[in-house]
Amino acid sequence: MSDRQAALDMALKQIEKQFGKGSIMKLGEQAERRVSTVSSGSLALDVALGVGGYPRGRIIEIYGPESSGKTTVSLHAIAEVQRQGGQAAFIDAEHAMDPVYAQKLGVNIDELLLSQPDTGEQGLEIAEALVRSGAVDIIVIDSVAALVPKAEIEGDMGDSHVGLQARLMSQALRKLSGAINKSKTIAIFINQIREKVGVMFGNPETTPGGRALKFYSTVRLEVRRAEQLKQGNDIVGNKTKVKVVKNKVAPPFRVAEVDIMYGEGISREGEILDMASELDIVQKSGAWYSYNEERLGQGRENSKQFLKENTDLREEIAFFIREHHGISEDSGAEGAEDSTLLD
């Protein structure tokens, strides 16, 4: 063995002794090369994400205009984690959590940890403490825009606090990112949209909280309402587009289209029907939808209602959709190779 190799081996032993086993290794020895995921609670979004759900131990940003469905998308993820026996937490900086609506989406509100912090620092410190405990599987911060720094709250109404929130987020994410990765916690940051003043060309929209969250996020989702869903003259929900604008674990820019029904959340029947029709698993002839020569109903809403009443048939169709896209039933726990190892 050469002197250089002996010196390297000694240095590696010293590093492992000081910082623990696994603190340094060769890239090819990486034990876990695949991304472990948890379903988003929406089959269409699981497919758009490319790995079958949200990657564990990563930061996710969900942003969009007001009332576009950001919190609904996050609550579905919480419900899915709880369904698998995991622990969830919700940092409600907006003080707008509706427990009745959350319950309708499948969230077990008796087990959900809820914090309504007074300041941005307090909210992020609570989030850090929960992440470092290693006992929380998913944490949702709603929203970044509402994480107001203490200095701004204690100051007068007209005071200028330029860059204060951006500095707070930058510092918090520097501390949080490593802990999130080690604890395998999914951290979802909900964010709002602001208009940049004086932008003549390009997109004038931006998200508050500075650039740090954009950099630290593994996945960024843009949620926007596409059209209203009507039953007769009544508006019963919105067709919503969820665009994956950044993805470090699969190809980005895929779009999931879902029906968000008032009081119900994401319509599983709607997304299954649309995806199955695209793949010709369900055949559409005129206004009629059919599966294996069995008629589901005339028109989309009637077919959705039929699938709602026949859950075994609905899940059978969902199985074939997952199989076509290579997503396993356990939310794609095998995932895909982690491309961030090469970032």
UniProtKB/Swiss-Prot annotation:
PROSITE patterns: RECA_1 (PS00321), RECA_2 (PS50162), RECA_3 (PS50163). It is found in: Cytoplasm. Keywords: ATP-binding, Cytoplasm, DNA damage, DNA recombination, DNA repair, DNA-binding, Nucleotide-binding, SOS response. ATP binds at residues 64-71. GO terms for biological process: DNA recombination; DNA repair; SOS response. SMART domains: AAA. Pfam families: RecA (PF00154), RecA_C (PF21096). It comes from the Bacteria. InterPro entries: AAA+_ATPase (IPR003593), DNA_recomb/repair_RecA (IPR013765), DNA_recomb/repair_RecA_CS (IPR020584), P-loop_NTPase (IPR027417), RecA-like_C (IPR049261), RecA-like_N (IPR049428), RecA_ATP-bd (IPR020588), RecA_C_sf (IPR023400). GO terms for cellular component: cytoplasm. One of its GO terms (molecular function) is ATP hydrolysis activity. Transmembrane segments: none annotated. The keyword Cytoplasm applies. PANTHER family: MITOCHONDRIAL DNA REPAIR PROTEIN RECA HOMOLOG-RELATED (PTHR45900:SF1), RECA (PTHR45900). Can catalyze the hydrolysis of ATP in the presence of single-stranded DNA, the ATP-dependent uptake of single-stranded DNA by duplex DNA, and the ATP-dependent hybridization of homologous single-stranded DNAs. It interacts with LexA causing its activation and leading to its autocatalytic cleavage. Belongs to the RecA family. This is Protein RecA. It comes from Bacillus cereus (strain ATCC 14579 / DSM 31 / CCUG 7414 / JCM 2152 / NBRC 15305 / NCIMB 9373 / NCTC 2599 / NRRL B-3711).
